[in-house]
């Protein structure tokens, strides 16, 4: 193990870089790292996966991560929020659709009992809330 990776959750190097690139919405860097073998489910030094820290406004980053095997339903252990909660709260319909088509569940509650649709409605994202209601049959 390289010295700089000691004490880090599994991943370290390229997984840390992947999470960083995803958080910045750097599509080409994300693609390069994934093609070079970065683990799409590896965690950064904060214990977060790239799909959890990705720039929610970049549906293309989400697509790349998911195409390479990122888990769309990974939850934050403290808050139980999933990427769909984040996309709904911030109003990123394109990213939400990508996550949903990749198998993300829309019927899961966070630690406060809120569904993604609740977060979209709280923030006034009518298009997102409408999609979520239609997709869940409400």
Curated annotation (Swiss-Prot):
Swapping residue 50 to V leads to an effect described as: In lung adenocarcinoma
Please indicate which superkingdom the organism of origin belongs to. Answer: Eukaryota
Q: Where does this protein chiefly localize?
A: cytoplasm
Presence of the UniProt keyword Glycosyltransferase in the record: no
Q: In which tissues is it expressed?
A: Isoform 2 is expressed in normal (keratinocytes, fibroblasts) and tumor cell lines.
| Gene3D superfamilies with a match to the protein in the record | Ankyrin repeat-containing domain
Q: Which residues form the signal peptide?
A: none
* Compartment list: Cytoplasm
Q: Which GO terms describe its biological process?
A: cellular response to cell-matrix adhesion; cellular response to nutrient; cellular senescence; megakaryocyte differentiation; negative regulation of cell population proliferation; negative regulation of epithelial cell proliferation; negative regulation of G1/S transition of mitotic cell cycle; positive regulation of transforming growth factor beta receptor signaling pathway
Q: Which Pfam families match?
A: Ank_2
Please report the residue spans annotated as repeat (ANK).
Answer: 13-39, 46-74, 79-108, 112-138
What are the GO MF terms of this UniProt record? cyclin-dependent protein serine/threonine kinase inhibitor activity; protein kinase binding
Q: Which InterPro entries match?
A: Ank_Repeat/CDKN_Inhibitor (IPR050776), Ankyrin_rpt (IPR002110), Ankyrin_rpt-contain_sf (IPR036770)
GO CC aspect terms? cytoplasm; cytosol; nucleus
Q: Which UniProt keywords apply?
A: ANK repeat, Cell cycle, Cytoplasm, Repeat, Tumor suppressor
| PROSITE patterns linked | ANK_REP_REGION
Subunit notes for this chain?
A: Heterodimer of CDKN2B with CDK4 or CDK6. Isoform 2 does not interact with CDK4 nor CDK6.
The protein's role, per its UniProt record: Interacts strongly with CDK4 and CDK6. Potent inhibitor. Potential effector of TGF-beta induced cell cycle arrest.
Family designation:
Belongs to the CDKN2 cyclin-dependent kinase inhibitor family.
Which protein are we looking at? Cyclin-dependent kinase 4 inhibitor B
Q: Which organism is it from?
A: Homo sapiens
Gene name, per UniProt, is: CDKN2B
């Amino acid at each position: 193990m390289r010295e700089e990776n000691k004490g880090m959750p599994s991943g370290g190097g390229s997984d840390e870089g992947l999470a960083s690139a995803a958080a910045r919405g750097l599509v080409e860097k994300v693609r390069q790292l994934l093609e070079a073998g970065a683990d799409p489910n590896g965690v950064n030094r904060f214990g977060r996966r790239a799909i959890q820290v990705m720039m929610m406004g970049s549906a293309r980053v989400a697509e790349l991560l998911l195409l390479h095997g990122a888990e769309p339903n990974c939850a934050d252990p403290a808050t139980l929020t999933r990427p769909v909660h984040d996309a709904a709260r911030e109003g990123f319909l394109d990213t939400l659709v990508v996550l949903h088509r990749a198998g993300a569940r829309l019927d899961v509650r966070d630690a406060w009992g809120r569904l993604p649709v609740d977060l979209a409605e709280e923030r006034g994202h009518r298009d997102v809330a409408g999609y979520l209601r239609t997709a869940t049959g409400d």
